[in-house]
Amino acid sequence: MLHILNQQNSIVNKFIAEMRDRKIQVDSMRFRRNLERMGEVTAYEISKTLDYTPTVVETPLGEAAVMQVSDEVVVATILRAGLPFHQGFLNYFDDAQNAFVSAYRKYSKDGKFKIKVEYISCGSLEGKVLILADP
């Protein structure tokens, strides 16, 4: 399923515009924060596609029925650029497991490149939903 977040007007357009704006993107903290915000928005949209289970919680006024995510979520990212985006996902999927890939482009003299993977840190994905959070 393909879902383009900025196809409809929303605050996402502001985040994308600031990340693309040459004058603004030099502010590394703002750039990282906008990446984190994009991770949050993306996590919210992905949450709509997950499986849910009805549960009951005890409130100060009694019991309330709520639907909660039943999928076990693993959020994976490519180090380093993806870390703020990854954090945005964790802000919403705070009980998710994490996975990391250390990779970079290794360029040859002709300008072509190969992806060099140094390591992957990931537990078992059996029966889990993997979200590859790579901006």
Feature map (PLM): residue ranges:
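PRPP-associated nucleotide enzymes
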Residues: 1-134
